[in-house]
Amino acid sequence: MSSSTPMCSETCARLTRRGVLALPALAGAGAVLAGCGVLKKGGSASSGKSSGAASPRAVATATGPHGGVVLSTEYQGAPMTVEVGPVAVKGKYTVARFHISTDSKEDVYLSQAFAQLENVGTTADVRMMSLEQSLVYVELGGNTEDLSGAVTKGAPKDAFPVFGALNDGVHSVEMLLPNMGVVVGVPVVKESEVDFNVDDVIAKANLQGPDPGPFKLERATVSMDGSSDTKQDEKSTTVTVAGDVTFATDSDQLSAQADSVLATVVEQIKKFPSGGELTITGHTDDVADDAHNQDLSERRAKAVSERLKKLTDSSAWKESVSGKGESSPRVPNDTDERRQINRRVEITLTPSKAAESSASPSASEAPSSATVPDPAGPVGKGPEGVDVKVSGKTMHMTIDHVVRVGGYLTGKVVLTSSEAVSMPVAPFALPGKMMEMRGLSGVWYVSSLTILSDGLRYLEADYAYPNGNRVPLANNFVYSLEPGTSQSLPVVWPDVGEDSITIDMPAGEYLYTKERVVARLTDIPVVNA
C-alpha cells in the first residue's frame, strides 16, 4: 500500500506530479518520449538503458488503438499498459481518455493508482501540462466510478480525467501519471475525432472541486553556499540575498562577500539591455523595534541599489527602492534560523522585453567557479545507481537519463530492492530550511531531487495555488516496495543547458522525519526531445 502521512488542508490542493518521461527516441522518426523507453510512431517500443530495476517500466509508443500514447510501465509489481489520450477540448473543459490494461492473471486494483487519501478511486493526482507554455492543469472530475474494482488480463478499464480548457493552438500535452511516468506528445484533437462521448464524461464529473487553473510553473535556484536564492517565471525574476552574508550585523555596510552575492543580479540585468522595472526591497527580522527595523531595511535596500550601479549599467531600468522592516517575513520569526531567513534584500526584475534574454529560460547565473559542495551520501553514476537506506532497509536508486522538453528537464528516479521496504515519503523531502526558503507547502512531497549546475542548486519546478500553497511537480505519496518490484519518482526541473547533469539529494534536518535519503547521482545524459 502507499505510504503517505495525513497532512494539513494543503494536501487538498493535490500536488501535480511533475514527471518523468522517457527514453530518447529519434525526433526525425517522429518519436515521442515518455517513461524509460523509445517511443516510435506505429512501431514497437525498444528498451533503452536499463539500470537496476527489472520489469517493463515506462516504455511508450505513440499510437494506441484509441489514438493515444501507450505507456508500458509497472504498478504494484504488476505489468501495466496505459494508453493516454487523445484529449479533446469542449467549452471550459479538456477531457482525456486512459485505457488501462495488464497481462497479469491476478487482479490489480486501481483505487490508489492515481490518487491518495480523500481522493482514492479517482484520477485526482494526475496532472496535464503544457511545458511549452509553462502551464499545469489539475484534474477536476473526481469520478469514482471508472476505477472501482480491478483490472486483469483481458479485462481492461477506462478512466476519463477532466481538466480546465487548454489554450487555443495547443496540439499536444504532457500527462503525469503518479509513480508511473510522464507521457509526452499526447495529441489534442477535435471532439468529433475521439471515440468517447465528451458530453457524458463532463456530465458525470464532479466539477465543483478545485480551481481549474491553469497554474504557472516557476523555476527556483539556491546558491551553493545559501547566500542567495532565485525564483523565475515568464514575466519576472526575483533574487533574494541573505542579509547576514551581504551586510555586517545590524548595519547597512556591505560585506566583502557582497559583490559575489550580487553577481546573480548583475547577470540578470545584463541579459535584458532594454531594461524594465527593477524593484529593490529590504527586510529585517523582529528583534529590534519597528522603527529601527524599518530604517535599517530602507538603508540596506539603498546600499544594494548603489552598489549595483557600480557593478553594471542599470540606466535602462526604472528603479524602485524601499524597505518593509519586519512587516513581510518569509517565515515566522520564532527561531534564530528562521530570523536569519527573514533578514534579506529582494531584487525583482521585470524586463520590458522578456524574450530578449539569450539564456536558458531557467538561467540564473552564478560564478562558474563556485565550489560544488562535497557529497554528503553515496555517489554513483545515474544509470548505474547507488544504494540508499530507508527504514533500515537497502534500496537501489537509478536514473537512466533526462529529457529536455519546453525549457524543462524531465526524468524519473527508479527505486528497487531485494527486500520488502516500508517507505514513507518524508525522507524524500528537502531539508526544512531549504523548504521554508522556497515557501513549499505541506510536508509530504518528493522535493529533494535537486540539480547541481554552474554554482547553483536547481530545485524541482513548482507552482502555487490561489490560496498561496506552493507545491513541486513530483509525487506526494510513495508505495512500500516489495522484493523484485520497482517504483518511479517522476520529477521536472528547470533546463540547465548542459549535456549531462548531476542530481543531489542534500543533507539537512527535517522536522517530520528522523531520516532523509541523501545521495548524489552523476553523469546523467540529457536527451533533446
Feature names for model-found ranges:
Residues 283-360, 367:
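Periplasmic OmpA-like peptidoglycan-binding domain that tethers envelope proteins to the cell wall
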Residues 67-70, 149-217, 351, 373-386, ...:
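Surface-exposed edge beta-strand/loop patches
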Residues 147-148, 246-255, 290-294, 477-478:
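Second-shell loop/turn segments in exported
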Residues 1-15, 22-34:
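N-terminal secretory signal peptides
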Residues 103-152, 264-268, 405, 418-482:
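The feature marks short-to-medium sequence segments in extracytoplasmic or secretory-pathway proteins
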Residues 36-46:
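Bacterial lipoprotein signal-peptidase II cleavage site
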